[in-house]
Amino acid sequence: MWRDSRRSHDWIAPVTERAAIVTGASSGIGLAVARMLAEEGHAVTLVARRPDKLQTAYEALLADGLEVQRVPADVGKEDDVVGAVAAHRDAYGRLDVLVNNAGVGIGAPIGELSTKRMDIQLNTNLRSIPLFYREALPMLAAAGAEHRRALVVNTASIAGKSGQPWLSIYSATKFGVVGFTQAMNKELSAQGIRSTALCPGFVDTAMADFAKEHTPGEKMIQTADIVVAVRMLLSLGPNCLVPEIVFERPAAG
């Protein structure tokens, strides 16, 4: 994974071949995508809010011989985002793939939704994404200049394509993710930085536990399906970008 590519007299500094940041990386989609990236040769910075769950994920990947580091961070807080990107830069020096996956959904009628619960969703699901772009842009731009295939994957939702009752703020944040992703392609794709919004329906993760009374987990979209999609994005040539991918369940037969 490491190569000696920068030389100063007799001193050699290690530089990673490819590197990635994944948020919401302690479980579910984030952990599955982080594992795939690490298995395919990326040095991966795992970012998640809960240190205990993050440690468990980190140890599991490390035990499999994968190059990872963990950074506990609440992506809804600007200082945590700045710190996470700085920690990645200090460890790996480059960024080829950024996966903005952290998210939270709080269901409630709009008349009963507190401002605090609105802000948690707005800050975590939406505001964090432009913050990561801003802080990571120098590294992403360097990767784009090098190989024209820097990639940012933003986890949105099917709720970002069709507003959902009792998930109004969640839906609004995911619509925002889709729109922001479109804007970033228009702004940054000429620099070799491509962005894709993932818009899945229910995925079989803990976040969808509330729906499993009516839709069993085995009938939901699987994290492996998301991994396949991200792997496909990584395989595309520099003259192709995919603005969004919508994942739906088959109609009930």
Feature locations, PLM:
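Conserved glycine-rich cofactor-binding loop
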Residues: 26-27
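Conserved glycine-rich Rossmann-like NAD(P)H-binding loop of the short-chain dehydrogenase/reductase
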Residues: 40-56
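The beta1-alpha1 cofactor-binding region of Rossmann-like NAD(H)/NADP(H)-dependent oxidoreductases
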Residues: 51-52, 72-83, 115
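Substrate-binding pocket helix/loop in short-chain dehydrogenase/reductase
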Residues: 109-110, 114-122
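Active-site helix of classical SDR
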Residues: 133, 173
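Residue(s) in the substrate-gating loop at a strand-loop-helix junction
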Residues: 157
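C-terminal helical subdomain
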Residues: 197-198, 205, 213-253
